[in-house]
Amino acid sequence: MKTAIFGFAGSGKTELFQALAGPGSEHNDRAMVKVPEPRLTPLVDLFKPKKVTPTEIEYLDLPGGSTKGEGLGQRVLNAVRPYDCLLAVLDHFSGLSDPDSQHRSIETDMIIADLAVVEKRLERIAQDKRKAKNLVDPKEESLLEQVQAVLEDEKPLRGDPDLSSRPELRGFCFLSAKPILYIWNVTEDNLEAEVTAEHAGEAHLAICAKLERELAEIEDPDEQQAFLEDLGIQASALKVIISKAYELLDLITFLTAGEKEVRAWAIPKG
């Protein structure tokens, strides 16, 4: 699973990336992170395999977008297209910007970018139709017109899963169709902050990236747990974000075991 982490300049996205990637990530923008899976341990004890392979998530820390209110910028929008899941970090700690407005700005940027892709393709189809009708796939044209209607209504495509999941549209890599997890980066004394109601294909979490980075620097698991308990946090951001990402992508973990290898696989639910 490939997840892109992005946000406006000063949102704290790099601090969150470092919390997820762990110690030694200060000079990197890409990390492979093992998915915690406690069910592997008894299987390893039973089979004593030569190899143990947990599931991994690739995180990419993208360059910061423009200043809040000026949009993400084309560079960021282009960079997130190949990724399976998006993780957008919203500033809810500085008091300089409203997270709801940041959320709306990100959604608007993605919708506009998708609309440009659709309009360009429909223009090409119209040109081909003028040359010869047999050059045009009427099914593709109809689907793109449906996509265009949703986007012109200023709605993200993920809100229409029946349309956005059509295999004929997969090659377009529409941004607003991608599952997205919004992280409200809060202060230490605002961990219980209320976040925006979730919409189809998106989720919202309140997390203090600064605290989570400090937690990631603690190597001893018992000390990590004591740190969480002192703060009244049930689970680390690493576990919570992975769990939410699996929900958004509709994935489950499947285990296989034998003397050669015990392995965890991320597979579609059902």
Question: What is each of the regions a protein language model found here?
Answer:
Residues I57-Y59, Y83-D84, I112, L228-I233:
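Glycine-rich loops and low-complexity Gly/Arg-rich segments
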Residues A31-P36, P63-E70, R81-E140, V150-D162, ...:
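Conserved Switch II/interswitch segment of TRAFAC-class P-loop GTPases
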Residues T53-P54, L96, R213-I218:
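Short, exposed beta-strand "edge-strand" segments with a Pro/Gly-rich flavor and a Y/T-containing core
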Residues M1-S94:
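Conserved G1/Walker A P-loop phosphate-binding module
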Residues M1-F17, A21-G22, N28, R124-G270:
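C-terminal-of-GTPase-core extension/linker across diverse P-loop GTPases
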Residues K50-V52, V76-V80, S105-T108, A200-A203, ...:
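Short, low-complexity, polar/charged sequence segments that are solvent-exposed and flexible
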